[in-house]
């Protein structure tokens, strides 16, 4: 019985926190986030240019992932677009100006730059 109660509590807390997180990013900050997308409470989405973040449907942004839309040195803001059905792994960093195509996986600890030469 205790295992059942613990499991129910985990499921309820997870679903409620995910929905509140999405409400916060969509309504309060005005980010474009598709249906079915899950954003971990430990993920960090840049709020200096919130309209510049677009995340497609059915994507997952995991704990510790960082999505940045501004360049502190040059004081520029550039949008970030993450497509449908994408996965951004633990502690991955997505820098300003990046477009991630549909069905992409960004591995844990990755640094994604707009231009790789």
What function would you assign to each model-found segment?
Residues 1-30, 36, 103:
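Terminal amphipathic alpha-helical/low-complexity segments used for targeting or macromolecular assembly
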Residues 23-25, 68-71:
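Short, composition-biased local secondary-structure segments
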Residues 18-22, 42, 47-48:
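Short glycine/threonine/proline-enriched tight-turn/helix- or strand-capping micro-motif at secondary-structure
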